[in-house]
């Protein structure tokens, strides 16, 4: 449902320092443009105070968290996720049917995050943005995702056509096969 933006920000295991540095001003600009927002932002422990102070002073509804083992709670509260481009998180978002903007870590091994972002974007599962373009393009990309209902519906439609259920069944079969071989 897109009458307001409930944005989940995930930065991977390192919580993406740049997300905590660059995103708050973009979120303030969203609020100032009269888009109703709530931010759920993963950050590092040493960023909690600064982010909390900023969001409070900007009167932005927010929840800051560090590592959590229950990310599903945040998925259920969100209608847009801004994340790094690890295969696991992008796969989870597709299976949870949540539109996303993936921002690949430019220093990832063999540039795998960039390749993941391109793959998922070409499939029509979400948008991607290079880290160097955050300041210039992220605000507009969020606004277009919010305003262009057909784009959002397209992402969700494409995500619905994808399922990893077969993967889990195959994984279960392989585990059982290995266990049976050992017995």
Model segments located where?
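Short glycine/serine-rich donor-binding loops of glycosyltransferases
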Residues: 71, 89-93, 97, 102, ...
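C-terminal alpha-helical cap of glycosyltransferases
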Residues: 164-183
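Donor-nucleotide binding loops and adjacent catalytic segments primarily
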Residues: 1-80, 114-117, 129-138
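Short hydrophobic beta-strand element within catalytic cores of glycosyltransferases
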Residues: 83, 99-110
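Acidic, glycine-centered active-site loop in nucleotide-sugar glycosyltransferases
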Residues: 97, 114-126
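Acidic donor-binding loop of glycosyltransferase active sites
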Residues: 60, 76-91, 98-99
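A short, well-ordered alpha-helix in the C-terminal region of glycosyltransferases
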Residues: 151-165
